[in-house]
Amino acid sequence: MSEAANWQPSAPISNLLKRADMIKKIRQFFTDRGVLEVDTPCMSQATVTDVHLSTFETRFLAPTMAKSLSLYMTTSPEYHMKRLLAAGSGPIYQMGRCFRNEEMGRYHNPEFTLLEWYRPHYDMYRLMDEVDDLLQQILTCHSAETLSYQQAFLRHLNIDPLSADETQIKEAAVRLNLASITDNEKDRDTFLQLLFMAGVEPYIGRDKPVFIYHFPASQAALASISTEDYRVAERFEVYFKGIELANGFYELTDSAEQQQRFEQDNRQRAALGLPKRSIDERFIAALKHGLPPCSGVALGIDRLVMLSVNAENLSEVMAFPVERA
C-alpha cells in the first residue's frame, strides 16, 4: 500500500472514543484519591543504563550554543518523577508518551502511552491493591490473583528459579523446545526470562489479572531487595489475557546502591558490546537529598485499551502507529 493510500487512522473511531473515555476515567480515579497529575520532559540529557532498553537519541544545537547537546527520548518518566518526589510533591501520576527504539508488532510500537504513578509510604502490596482497584474499575474484571515468581515457576515448570542449578534450568528449556539457546546463552537471568515467557506467561491471567511478585534480586532494576528474603526483589508485574500490563517496585532509595547498579549495567553493556551510558547525576543527587519510602508502577495504556475493546493488535487502538506516522 502506498503512503498516500494509508492516510486514515488504523484504529476505528469507535475505539478512539473508548480510549478517550478510559483516559478520562483514569484521571478521575486519581483525582478522587488525591493524587497529583504531573508533566515531565519527553527528552532528557541522560538515559537509562538498562541493557534491555534501546533509546532514541537526537542532538540540539541552538544558534547561541557553541556545542550541541545530546538528548534522549525518555523510555519512562521514572527519573523525573522521582526527582519531584524528592522535592516533596507527594503522591503523583502521569500519562504521557514514551519511546523505545526496539521491536514493533502486536503489542509494541516505538512510541506508546504510559501511565506511571508513585505512592509515598506505600509498600509493594498496598500499591498492588490499588492497581487491582484500577483494573477492576476500568476493565470491569474480577479481583486479581497473586502469585510469587517462585510459585509460578514451581506450578508451571516444576523448578525453583531461586535455587535451580544450570542443569535444571537447561533441562526446563529443552522441555519447552528452547534447546537451541542452551549452548550459546550463559546469562542465568536471560534463561529465566525465556522460561517465564515460554512456560509461564501463556498460562497465567486467563480469566482475571494476576500479579507476579518477588522477582529474583538479580532482576531488581530500580526496586529494593526484600528484607525478609535477600534472594528476591520487591518488584511485581501484572498479566491479563496473555498481555503484560504493568511493572511495579517498592523503590530503591539508597543513592550509593543505585549508583552501583548503574555502574554494573554499564559493565554488562561493555561485555555485550553495547555503548556505555552516562549516569543520570541529577537523579542520583535527588536520591542523595532523600527519596521518601515509596512504591511506583508503570502501566501500558495502549495495552489496557486493547483489553477493554477486545482488540488483537495495538494498531486497533492507536490512531497512527509507526507504519502510518
UniProtKB/Swiss-Prot annotation:
MF-aspect GO terms: acid-ammonia (or amide) ligase activity; ATP binding; lysine-tRNA ligase activity; tRNA binding
Catalytic activity line of the entry: D-beta-lysine + L-lysyl-[protein] + ATP = N(6)-((3R)-3,6-diaminohexanoyl)-L-lysyl-[protein] + AMP + diphosphate + H(+)
Segments traversing the membrane: none
InterPro entries: Aa-tRNA-synt_II, aa-tRNA-synth_II, aa-tRNA-synth_II/BPL/LPL, EpmA, Lys-tRNA-synth_II_C
Residues binding ATP, per UniProt: 100-102, 109, 244-245, 300
Gene Ontology cellular-component terms listed: cytosol
Subunit structure: Homodimer.
Family according to the record: Belongs to the class-II aminoacyl-tRNA synthetase family. EpmA subfamily.
Task performed by this protein: With EpmB is involved in the beta-lysylation step of the post-translational modification of translation elongation factor P (EF-P). Catalyzes the ATP-dependent activation of (R)-beta-lysine produced by EpmB, forming a lysyl-adenylate, from which the beta-lysyl moiety is then transferred to the epsilon-amino group of a conserved specific lysine residue in EF-P.
Name of this chain's protein: Elongation factor P--(R)-beta-lysine ligase
